[in-house]
Amino acid sequence: MNTTVKRIDPASLNLKEQVVAINRVTKVVKGGKNLSFSALVVIGDPSAKVVGYGVGKAKEVPSAIRKGIEAAKKNLRRINSLDTTIPHQVLGVFASSQVLLKPASPGTGVIAGGAVRAVITACGVPNVLTKSIGRRNPHNVVKATIVALEMLRDRNTVAEMRGLAVEKL
């Protein structure tokens, strides 16, 4: 199965970045302890419905964040959503983290925890209800949220997949 993914050019987008987590990592060696940092960064363009995440590691926090942003630009994905909310309920699973996304009526806003909120606001969904189930590790929660967003299908896509007219759904 040859699936080619069309790469999204980050230069043409108005990307906003958000740091989700910064970890201080210590490696114990013979001469003492080596201190470094890792940063989990989410970037997205709300108007283009594009989101991506990246992890950067460096000896200093700003360098780790910069590397995370560069990694996220190589990992951009387009999201199917309506203007006001998501088309249907979906459950995204990554490792032992699960993220449940539900459509919400206009005016509800984004009801979400830290890592899920960063992804949802980065991709520009204005009204959604979320629930994080299982482990709350920020890395896995971000990945589970993106898995859930990738599973979204609008009416036209479902009709095309089933070979039906949109009116028959």
UniProtKB/Swiss-Prot annotation:
- Give GO BP annotations, semicolon-separated: translation
Q: Which GO terms describe its molecular function?
A: rRNA binding; structural constituent of ribosome
Give the CC-aspect GO terms: small ribosomal subunit
Residue limits of the S5 DRBM domain? Answer: 15-79
**Pfam families noted in UniProt:** Ribosomal_S5, Ribosomal_S5_C
| InterPro entries (UniProt xref) | Ribosomal_Su5_D2-typ_SF, Ribosomal_uS5, Ribosomal_uS5_bac-type, Ribosomal_uS5_C, Ribosomal_uS5_N, Ribsml_uS5_D2-typ_fold_subgr
* Alphabetical keyword list: Ribonucleoprotein, Ribosomal protein, RNA-binding, rRNA-binding
Record's comment describing the protein's domains: The N-terminal domain interacts with the head of the 30S subunit; the C-terminal domain interacts with the body and contacts protein S4. The interaction surface between S4 and S5 is involved in control of translational fidelity.
> Subunit structure, per the record?
Part of the 30S ribosomal subunit. Contacts proteins S4 and S8.
Q: Which family does it belong to?
A: Belongs to the universal ribosomal protein uS5 family.
Physiological role: With S4 and S12 plays an important role in translational accuracy.
Recorded hits in NCBIfam families, A to Z, give: rpsE_bact (TIGR01021)
Name of the protein: Small ribosomal subunit protein uS5
Which organism does this sequence originate in? Solibacter usitatus (strain Ellin6076)
Q: What is the lineage of its organism?
A: Bacteria, Pseudomonadati, Acidobacteriota, Terriglobia, Bryobacterales
